[in-house]
Amino acid sequence: VTLMDGSGLSVQDAVPAMLLADLLSAAAAPDESQRRTTALRPMLVGLPVAGSSGTLAERYDGPAAGGRGWVRAKTGTLTGVNSLAGTVLDAEGRVLVFALLSNGPNPVSVRPRLDALAAALRSCGCH
């Protein structure tokens, strides 16, 4: 983790996707006897729902429609950066966590692809 400023606006700031996924995984862990799980669990409730609330209300059409109502995620958009990190319930009822980050000249064009990737996790049958 590299934090050059307190706002997250510096191009030198860097937070690895794995850190975001690890935080989400700890929050979603089934064992609530873990103190960190109990402390982080409220974070999941506040995540926007695909096609329904917050920054995801107008998203998840077309190829990503399968994620509507299933994907819960926080979006992040800055100049040249687009991210989506959250949870999705897969076809077998497991909670999966994900953190997708893109860095390029046109983050808006990447947004539907991030949505489609998160929605694809819904149909995952990992057994």
Task: Name each model-derived stretch.
Residues 1-127:
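Small-residue-rich helix-loop
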